[in-house]
Amino acid sequence: MERIIVTAKFHTGHRQLGYPGKCKFVHGHTWHGKVTIAAEEFPRDDIDMSLEFGDIKNVMRFMDHKMLVTEQDTTFLNSEFFEPEGVVVLRGKGPSVENVAYYVYNGVVDVIRKQYPGRNVRYKVEVTIQETENNIFQVEKDITI
């Protein structure tokens, strides 16, 4: 089994609409992300590279210094005070650590699909997102591309 492990740190703001506690207010985090991709044997390009690590890291870094929202947060989406390129819209009902992890997971799967389409390789993709020192969410799925 071969593994690629990529880590990144990124800083964002967010808020949890409808949450009864302090997280309903705009606040920020320094997130730590870790992506592990495993395969029995990775395909290699013509210079024997398996995947472009920078493309995987950029999935996480794209969120750096941006406001994370969902489609329900019309305050940010419709505001003239926020630059559109400073806002990242996540799927789901809130910009939770769970939805950040799935945002990264989906982005990593897109990177694999673009770099090695149609190779029929089975990958295990694991994304770990640490929101705070104590709050971590992990998603792990097998895919064939």
Question: Where do the language-model regions lie?
Answer:
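Charge-rich, low-complexity N-terminal segments
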Residues: 1-145
